[in-house]
Structure formats: C-alpha cells, structure tokens
C-alpha cells in the first residue's frame, strides 16, 4: 500500500487532533536531606521564593533558600515520614489562607483549618499570606478612637483606628490581659477582632478562648493558634495568616483589630528556621532580616481611604474608610527594652504601653508606666470628653512619682507639695482596674472628672475603689440620659459639665460609699 505525501500529512494532523493528554506544568525534585523540619531538595529549577512545594502524603513545604544547586525549604507540619530520595514537586502557588465572615467565632490553625471541632468553615475565598502593605497615597490619617476600656490607656495613651500600639513588658505583667480586655470591649462597637497566639501553651490559649466566650466577644473574633508544640514554620507564619484575615474587613470598609501574642516568640521561631537553613547569624544570633520580618507585618496595619475601599470592592462599598489596628505584644527579659527585638518593634510601631513588674507587684494593675509609655498618633483620635478631662492626669502622675522619690529624703514638706502628693496618690489609686471589666467612655469620664475636679480629696485611699463603684452606680441610675449621651457622642460642653458637676455634688451629699 502506497501513501502519497498529502495523505500522510492529513493522517498526522488527524492523529494530533485525536491526541488527548492532561498537560500539567510539573517541576519535580528529590529530597537529599531532612533535619529538624528543614528539607534540602535537588532538581527544582523553576521554584520561586516562598512557593509551596508538595511533599509525599499531602503535606507542604515553603521554599525559603534558593541556592545554586539546591533549595532549602521549611516543612509546614510533621516531617517524621519524609526520607531522603522522596520525590517532591512545585505547585506554582504561594501560601493562601481562607478569609471571610465565616471565620468569626472560630479557632483555626496557621493554615486557616478549624481546630475547635465545630465543623468546616464557610469562607468567602482565599487571600495570600504575604501581601504588600497599602502605599502612602492609599492611607488616611488616624482620627477615630478605639476604646480599650482601660482608664489608664484611653486617658493617657489613646489608640486610634489604624494605629500600631506595642504592649511591652516582662512575663506575668498583664500584657495578654490588656489585649483580651481590649477585644472584649469591642463586642458592641462592631469592630472585628483577630487574636493570634504564637508559641503559647495550648492550655493558656484554651483559657483565653473560654474567657472570650464567657464575655460574649468570641462571636466577633477569629482566634489563630500556633502553639508551642507546633512546627517553627507555623509559628513564624501565624501572624501573617491572622493579618490576612483582618485585612479582609479593612479592605471592605470596616474596622478590625488584631493582637499578636507575642512577636518575641515569632522572632525566636524565625531565628531557629534561619539558623537551620545556614543563614549567617547577627546580633543575638538573629538573622539580618529580623527587622523586615516585623516591619512588613506591622506596616499592613493601617487606615485606608475611601478610594482604596471603592477600588478594592469595585464600587460595591462607597464613602467608607477601612482600618486594621495592631496591638503587637513583646516580652522583655528583666525589663530590658534596649534588647534587639524590643528596640526594633518600638521603632516600627506608633507608640508603646510599657507594663512594669514592680508596679504590678505593688498592686497597681494595669501596671502601666506613664513615664515611658506613649502614643504618637492616638491623640488626634481621642474622644473629645476624655481629651478635655484627662489633660492633668499624666502630669499629676509624673509629678507624683518625682515628688514621691524626693519626699523619701525630705522630712519637712510644704502644703503645696503635700497636696500634690495626695492628689497623685488618689489618681494612682483611681487608675487601678479589675481584669475583664472594661469601662465605657461615660464611666471613664465620670471617674476622671471626679479626680480632676477635686471630688476625691475627702475620700480615704483605701475607699477610692468603693467610692468609684458607688459613684458610677449612682450616675447610671440617676443620670441615665447623660451617660447615654456621652457614650453616643463623646462630646464635652458647658451643659454636660454642669450636669456632671450637679450629679457629683448630689452624690457627695449622700455619703453612700
């Protein structure tokens, strides 16, 4: 049988058309070393920095070191079943986590998988873990307050929506308690919260989740967990996962709050990974890019303008700004704020709340040191009534500390100095507050008004707590409209001042504390 060239050509074309194969861009490699959660792979020619690599058994690794003849990757989970010679392949994807309202009220791991036993999550999509922070033009200045519910913080170190405020202190000084109370205080405000637990004991995290549930704040909160028993890679990535979940609300014109508890442990996890990858160590054995580790995370917390939200939602949301407020926590060793990681994070954030062991042990809780605590941008966002009333609080406390130190050596004090000392003592006592009892704007205003206008003068130091509780109970029952007005508007004018004064005078007459 003879075929001419035309028939051969037609036959080849026909065969090509009939040929069916699932074409898949694959780039396979071989594991050449496995140790401490780090794998070294040969043969991956086209792998990207940060790309997910599929391992045997459905597990994944992330490519972090791209070298001339091999790739260093960190395993996202258990690595006991991996062995030299196993085949791996690239995926062409970077790590993404589920985002959306379906995550509210849930406890998830770094990868966004539920670990609370409440079934699958109904997410609205996925978002990359690493996202470039909004640019300068896309931002709006901080001008709205976020109430923590703590008098000491809202009066002296106010926090605005879109701000980064560091909570720093030694272990067991109330850092987590302050952050949890700030989350509990948002349950009526509409602000969505994310709590990221890094390198903590599972029992501690379970206690935090239980407290949030007891106080009705869990329904408004996403809890991201990378406990101490989990791989260093998951502890390193957990803050970025939580940030992506918080950004979902920011980008849609809503306000969100994220707590990183704590970034010291994330830095330690990253140091562990870097040393295992044979990266050159620097100060305190941290790698050279540990500053960038935190700066690229915290710069994502911002207040974005109307145009950004409109562009992101393709016109679905108009006239709304969005914000992501960050409360990173750093644990210091013996009060050393000049160590490497604390100084890095202090320089990145917009202020810090310094909690001191000595103050905590002396019974002053929250143990805020007003001398070195500062909020660099929150003043513009402070509620009007708190701003007007709290001007003298910080000054009174600063003068009191100075005079208290001086009075130890001076036997005879003049009347003015003694009056300043007594006022400072009373303000210090008034700043004390119980855990899980955040205060409304109106309640804070009443307490600060009492201190500023001299209503505490005749009250014994050990009765100030009882005096405050009775005063607030009286104002809530007898001046409900005033309290509701202050909570709703935050305004301060002659009428409000007059009504507050009249209420205080009547309460003092009753002597019911």
Curated annotation (Swiss-Prot):
Topology term for the membrane: Peripheral membrane protein
Assigned EC number: 7.1.2.2
Lineage of source species: Bacteria, Pseudomonadati, Pseudomonadota, Gammaproteobacteria, Alteromonadales
Keywords: ATP synthesis, ATP-binding, Cell inner membrane, Cell membrane, CF(1), Hydrogen ion transport, Ion transport, Membrane, Nucleotide-binding, Translocase, Transport
Keyword Transport attached: yes
Subunit-structure text: F-type ATPases have 2 components, CF(1) - the catalytic core - and CF(0) - the membrane proton channel. CF(1) has five subunits: alpha(3), beta(3), gamma(1), delta(1), epsilon(1). CF(0) has three main subunits: a(1), b(2) and c(9-12). The alpha and beta chains form an alternating ring which encloses part of the gamma chain. CF(1) is attached to CF(0) by a central stalk formed by the gamma and epsilon chains, while a peripheral stalk is formed by the delta and b chains.
Name of protein: ATP synthase subunit alpha 2
Catalytically driven reaction(s): ATP + H2O + 4 H(+)(in) = ADP + phosphate + 5 H(+)(out)
Function: Produces ATP from ADP in the presence of a proton gradient across the membrane. The alpha chain is a regulatory subunit.
Gene: atpA2
């Amino acid at each position: 049988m003879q075929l001419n060239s035309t028939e051969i050509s037609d036959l080849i074309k026909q065969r090509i058309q009939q040929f069916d194969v699932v074409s898949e861009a694959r780039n396979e490699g071989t594991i050449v070393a496995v140790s401490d959660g780090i794998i070294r792979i040969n043969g991956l020619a086209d792998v990207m920095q940060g790309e997910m690599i599929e391992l045997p058994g459905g597990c994944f690794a992330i490519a972090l070191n791209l070298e001339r003849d091999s790739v260093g990757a960190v395993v996202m989970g258990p690595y006991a079943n991996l062995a030299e010679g196993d085949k791996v392949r690239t995926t062409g994807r970077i790590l993404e986590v589920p985002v959306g309202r379906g995550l509210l009220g849930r406890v998830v791991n770094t990868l966004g998988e539920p670990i609370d036993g409440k079934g699958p999550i109904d997410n609205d999509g996925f978002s990359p873990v690493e996202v470039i922070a909004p640019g300068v033009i896309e931002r709006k200045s901080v001008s709205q307050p976020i109430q923590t519910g703590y008098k000491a913080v809202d009066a002296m170190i106010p926090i605005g929506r879109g701000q980064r405020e560091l909570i720093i202190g030694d272990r067991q000084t109330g850092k987590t308690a302050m952050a949890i109370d700030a989350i509990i205080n948002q349950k009526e405000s509409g602000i969505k919260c994310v709590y990221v637990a890094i390198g903590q004991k599972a029992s501690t995290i379970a206690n935090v989740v239980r407290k949030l549930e007891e106080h009705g704040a869990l329904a408004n909160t996403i809890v991201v967990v990378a406990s101490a028993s989990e791989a260093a890679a998951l502890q390193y990535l957990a803050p970025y996962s939580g940030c992506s979940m918080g950004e979902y609300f920011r980008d849609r014109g809503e306000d969100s709050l994220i707590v990183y508890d704590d970034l010291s442990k994330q830095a330690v996890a990253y140091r562990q990974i870097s040393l295992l990858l044979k990266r050159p160590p620097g100060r305190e054995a941290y790698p050279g890019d540990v500053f960038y580790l935190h700066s690229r995370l915290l710069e994502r917390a911002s207040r974005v303008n109307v145009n950004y939200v409109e562009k992101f939602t393709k016109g679905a949301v108009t006239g709304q700004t969005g914000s992501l407020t960050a409360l990173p926590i750093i644990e210091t060793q013996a009060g050393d704020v000049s160590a490497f990681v604390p100084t890095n994070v202090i320089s990145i954030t917009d202020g810090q709340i310094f909690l001191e062991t000595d103050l905590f042990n002396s019974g002053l809780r929250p143990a805020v040191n007003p001398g070195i605590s500062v909020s660099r941008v929150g003043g513009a966002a402070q509620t009007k009534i708190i701003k007007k009333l709290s001007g003298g609080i910080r000054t009174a406390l600063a003068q009191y500390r100075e005079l208290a130190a001086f009075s130890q050596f001076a036997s005879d004090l003049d009347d003015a100095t003694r009056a300043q000392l007594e006022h400072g003592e009373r303000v210090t006592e008034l700043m004390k507050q119980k855990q899980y009892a955040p205060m409304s704007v109106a309640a804070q205003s009443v307490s600060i008004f009492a201190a500023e206008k001299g209503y505490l003068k005749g009250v014994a130091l050990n009765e100030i707590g009882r005096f405050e509780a009775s005063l607030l109970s009286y104002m809530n029952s007898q001046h409900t409209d005033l309290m509701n007005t202050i909570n709703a508007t935050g305004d301060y004018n002659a009428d409000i001042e007059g009504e507050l004064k009249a209420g205080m005078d009547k309460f003092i007459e009753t002597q019911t504390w």
